[in-house]
Amino acid sequence: NFGYLTRGGYSKKINGKRTFIKKDPNQYYTYTGALVDYSQVVELKTPFRGYTAWHKYSDAQIKSLHAWILFIGERDSIDIRKGLPEWVKEKGAEGFEFNSDAYYGKVKGLLNHTNTRKDKFDMFPQQELMDMLISL
C-alpha cells in the first residue's frame, strides 16, 4: 500500500523544485511514480488530506490488521474500542482526521498517525477498514 495516488502522473523534486511528471492521463501513480492497477484503486467520495484516489488495502491486510489489533490490545491492556474506532462510529471518515486531544495525549485507546499528526498519510478511510474498526 503506497497511500494516496495521483492520476496522470506524479510529483517529483527536481533541482529542489516540485515538478509534476506527466504520464498516461487515464492511469494512477504512486508518489514514487509506480503505475497502479485499477483493481487496487479506491476513489473516495470526499477527499482525505487533499486526495480522493488511494492505494486500496487488500482484504488480507485488513484481516491481518484486525488480528494484530486484537493481539496488541490484549497484550498491552488497551481498550481498542476507544479512539479511532469510536470516532469512526460517530463521524465516519472524519474520524481519521487530526484530533488535538489525541495529539496532547488525552485519549487512551487505538490511534494512528493521522489522528496525531497533520503531515502523515499512513491510513485513510477505506470503507472496509472502517467496517473492521467499527466491528472491534
What does each of the following model-derived ranges do?
Residues 3-136:
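Basic/polar, cationic surfaces and motifs that engage anionic cell-wall
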